[in-house]
């Protein structure tokens, strides 16, 4: 299983989930070069190349699942359309499928930079100002990411992410095994209709009353079991909070 993380955190943010999957699956949790000390973000294609090179060196021949959270959806979608590895399933948790103009993204960058850096400077104290929760269990991932973040790397990432252009094509076959999940009260829910129109053969579960990435943050074991169920049975499990 390959996981693409959200904005402002490191790949380790998927470790609470991976702990419940590691006995069954080889879990790969790369951190974007944006949040790596001394590394230079070049482009989405370069990020994908680095991931592909690692998978090749490890002898990975197929992926049971590609998982992506928030803005990780942007990189995951690029990976899915570029990789030559067979991908059996994909799951997007609150995917930030925003299509934002170049000028707006340029304006956003300094605000995002100071928001993420403030998490490092305040040791996570400002988390509640930018996220619906400030659980201690997730603060360290934001602090570690903020420590290594440079303005130049963030600017480069935002320059080729969330672009105002059509979503990349996914084969109908992969769409049939792809799950685009949103919480009913999260801000990213507004992207759902556009994604449904772009990928009509996908699955679109709604977690009623849930906020952005709430299930994986508050119940990583349940989230992990859900992913395993999808891989092993090719369908969502019966969860009491899924909108009927």
Segment roles from a protein language model:
Residues 159-197, 216:
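Conserved serine/cysteine hydrolase catalytic core
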Residues 199-213:
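Catalytic histidine neighborhood in serine/cysteine hydrolases
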Residues 81-118:
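Flexible "cap/lid" loop of the alpha/beta hydrolase fold
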Residues 67-76:
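Gly/Ala-rich beta-loop-alpha elbow adjacent to hydrolase catalytic centers
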Residues 28-65:
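Active-site loop/oxyanion-hole signature of alpha/beta-hydrolase fold enzymes
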Residues 1-37:
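Conserved HGGG/HGGXW glycine-rich cap/lid loop of the alpha/beta-hydrolase fold
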Residues 210-223:
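Catalytic histidine-centered segment of alpha/beta-hydrolase-like enzymes
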Residues 102-103, 119-172:
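Conserved alpha/beta-hydrolase catalytic His-Asp/Glu region
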């Amino acid at each position: 299983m390959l996981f693409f993380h959200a904005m402002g955190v490191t790949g380790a943010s998927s470790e609470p989930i991976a702990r419940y999957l590691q006995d069954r699956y080889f879990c790969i949790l790369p951190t974007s070069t944006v949040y790596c000390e001394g590394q230079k973000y070049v482009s989405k294609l370069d990020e994908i190349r680095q991931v592909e090179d690692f998978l090749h060196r490890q002898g990975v021949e197929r992926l049971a699942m590609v998982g992506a959270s928030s803005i990780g959806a942007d990189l995951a979608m690029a990976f899915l359309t570029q990789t030559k590895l067979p991908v059996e399933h994909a799951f997007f948790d609150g995917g930030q499928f925003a299509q934002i103009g170049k000028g707006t993204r340029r304006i956003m960058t300094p605000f995002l930079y100071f928001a993420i850096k403030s998490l490092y400077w305040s040791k996570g104290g400002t988390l509640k100002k930018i996220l619906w929760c400030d659980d201690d269990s997730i603060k360290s991932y934001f602090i570690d990411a903020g420590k290594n973040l440079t303005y130049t790397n963030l600017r480069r990432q935002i320059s080729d992410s969330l672009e105002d252009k059509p979503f990349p094509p996914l084969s109908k076959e992969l769409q049939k095994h792809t799950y685009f999940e949103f919480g009913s009260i999260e801000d990213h829910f507004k992207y759902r209709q556009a994604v449904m129109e772009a990928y009509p053969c996908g699955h679109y579960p709604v977690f009623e009353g849930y906020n952005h990435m709430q299930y994986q943050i508050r119940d990583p074991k349940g989230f992990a079991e859900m992913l395993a169920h999808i891989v092993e049975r090719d369908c969502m499990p019966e969860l009491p909070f899924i909108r009927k």
